[in-house]
Amino acid sequence: DSPPRRAAWTLPAGYAMAAVAVTAYLASGLFPGTAATVPVALGHFTAGFAGAVCLGGLVLILITARPDAAGILDPSAFRAHLVVERLALVWFGAAVPMVAMQAAADADVPVTRMLSEGGFGAGIGASETARAWIVVATAAAVIAVCSRLTVRWEWHLPLLIPAVVGVVAVPVTGGAGEGP
């Protein structure tokens, strides 16, 4: 393998190892949680990872890109743009199920019961974090759509706004009086 190809597999391999470690720890019984703990932890990890890479990729594009006279990204910045474009879909795909999983986890009911008995709206209304996941999913969708529609350098600056909002929405939700 050439060094760039090996480097391209480093990040997904690291993610896979971390996901397996988190799953093994939570499934070991050392963590006193519910059955929803593993999917919620993996959803948090996947969405956080994808969101951080999207935000970092946008910053990388804005700092290092050398656009041509028409404002089109150079080849190296375009590679970063492709990473942002693809991981925004992963971010969105992780955030959407997290809305239901977080609402169910906060209500301490299984997701299937909450969805089948019509408690989804009440679950979202009672869970601040589930509403934050709606914000994350919306931000990820905006980035996924907009990054797909343009390869001009100027459009990457406004994309920082939903990226920052999406990355910080879940961590800043709640208050100091709430538990971990």
Give the ranges of each region predicted by the language model.
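Polytopic transmembrane helical bundles with strong interfacial aromatic enrichment
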Residues: 1-180
